[in-house]
């Protein structure tokens, strides 16, 4: 059934969604947004999905819709451009609801940066700059799982995709064909990264100071991090609710043998000791007994402070390219990419471009980076 508030159409059942998805798939683009709650959960809880085609706005109630198959097909339809803004969490909502992600993806925050506007520009600021409209902020933190939603919430949600469609048309008209292709390439990479669900057994590589642990201790850290990641997903609780991040390194280094030792670990929550203490003690003991053949390799040390001038010279290559192209410099070369490049051969070389430097960035700046390192 379609229930209409002023200029807003509600979709609250599977048949209506399927019917509307057929119509949406005839459109050249759709503006999409979500409202969700993520207070004490691992996954976002969807409260609303908004769709706009530039003329009308729809609100889909995810608390009532059960069959998301037609919407998943819409998201994957390559003929319809999906327009979102700063959409990493929206993508998580779509993946959780439908099992699919939007392609092709046009992120208006990225588009603004491609046009030389500020990097990581907030939605309200972008709407003000492009459309000269001041958006109300009253509803950004409201409860989107409550029913009924207030008139203010519904208006706010519908206005979001109405203005998003207008912003898209304004920005898209200013993008060169080349920049538009790069922007969609970035959107595709964002989607691909989310599709590659992170391996829980690789999470230990991100722990601060992990490089200071011996391989046997790293085996313990690996098992702790994998358990933490798996339990966060299983329990739908934040990782730090399962086991606080600051406890991981001392647990792997000190190898507590009983609950008293466990409770003495700095920042260890009493709830964790009470609920999971016995299991953690056994997990640590088992991981510490693993044969050497199952230990991870030592993690690489961080780059020394003396690479700072070299990093600056590499970053300058990206800044010069940004000036040439009229783009925000932050779009060019992420710090992680430059650090990976340096780690491939520092201090004496040879250096190798990391796989994370892809597409147009690799084509336009890859050789210049290698040349700069050769002459350093």
Curated annotation (Swiss-Prot):
Its EC number is 3.1.13.5. It comes from the Bacteria. GO terms for molecular function: 3'-5' exonuclease activity; nucleic acid binding; nucleotide binding; ribonuclease D activity. Gene3D superfamilies: HRDC domain (1.10.150.80), Ribonuclease H-like superfamily/Ribonuclease H (3.30.420.10). Its main location: cytoplasm. Its cofactor is a divalent metal cation. HAMAP family: RNase_D (MF_01899). One of its GO terms (cellular component) is cytoplasm. Exonuclease involved in the 3' processing of various precursor tRNAs. Initiates hydrolysis at the 3'-terminus of an RNA molecule and releases 5'-mononucleotides. It is found in: Cytoplasm. This is Ribonuclease D. Signal peptide: none annotated. PANTHER family: RIBONUCLEASE D (PTHR47649:SF1). The lineage of its organism: Bacteria, Pseudomonadati, Pseudomonadota, Gammaproteobacteria, Pseudomonadales. InterPro entries: 3'-5'_exonuclease_dom, HRDC-like_sf, HRDC_dom, HRDC_dom_sf, RNase_D, RNase_D-like, RNaseH-like_sf, RNaseH_sf. Residues 214-294 form the HRDC domain. Belongs to the RNase D family. Residues 8-176 form the 3'-5' exonuclease domain. The keyword Glycoprotein does not apply. It catalyses: Exonucleolytic cleavage that removes extra residues from the 3'-terminus of tRNA to produce 5'-mononucleotides. Keywords: Cytoplasm, Exonuclease, Hydrolase, Nuclease, tRNA processing. One of its GO terms (biological process) is tRNA 3'-end processing.
């Amino acid at each position: 059934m379609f229930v209409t508030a002023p200029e807003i159409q509600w979709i609250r059942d599977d048949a209506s969604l399927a019917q509307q998805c057929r119509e949406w798939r005839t459109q050249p683009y759709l503006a999409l947004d979500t409202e969700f709650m993520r207070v004490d959960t691992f996954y976002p809880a969807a409260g609303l999905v908004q769709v706009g085609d530039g003329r009308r706005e729809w609100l889909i109630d995810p608390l009532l819709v059960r069959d998301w198959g037609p919407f998943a097909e819409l998201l994957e339809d390559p003929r319809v451009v999906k327009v979102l803004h700063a959409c990493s969490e929206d993508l998580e909502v779509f993946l959780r609801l439908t099992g699919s992600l939007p392609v092709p993806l046009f992120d208006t925050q990225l588009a603004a940066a491609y046009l030389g506007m500020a990097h990581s520009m907030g939605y309200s600021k972008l709407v003000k700059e492009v459309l000269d409209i001041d958006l109300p902020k009253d509803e950004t933190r409201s409860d989107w799982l409550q029913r009924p939603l207030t008139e203010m919430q519904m208006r706010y949600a519908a206005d979001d995709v109405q203005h998003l469609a207008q912003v898209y048309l304004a920005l898209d008209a200013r993008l060169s064909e080349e920049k538009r292709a790069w922007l969609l390439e970035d959107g595709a990479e964002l989607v691909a990264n989310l599709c590659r669900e992170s391996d829980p057994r690789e999470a230990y590589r991100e722990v601060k100071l992990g490089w200071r642990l011996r391989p046997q201790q790293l085996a313990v850290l690996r098992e702790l991090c994998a358990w933490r990641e798996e339990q966060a997903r299983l329990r739908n609780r934040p990782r730090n609710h399962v086991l606080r991040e600051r406890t991981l390194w001392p647990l792997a280094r000190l190898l507590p043998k009983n609950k008293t030792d466990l409770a003495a670990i700095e920042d260890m929550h009493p709830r964790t000791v009470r609920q999971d203490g016995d299991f953690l003690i056994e997990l640590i003991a088992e991981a510490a007994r693993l044969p050497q053949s199952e230990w991870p390799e030592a993690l690489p040390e961080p780059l020394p402070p003396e690479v700072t001038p070299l990093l600056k010279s590499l970053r300058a290559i990206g800044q010069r390219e940004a000036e040439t192209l009229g783009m925000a410099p932050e779009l060019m070369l992420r710090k992680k990419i430059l650090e990976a490049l340096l780690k491939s051969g520092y201090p004496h070389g040879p250096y190798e471009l990391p796989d994370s430097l892809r597409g147009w960035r690799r084509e336009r700046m890859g050789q210049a980076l290698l040349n700069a390192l050769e002459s350093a």
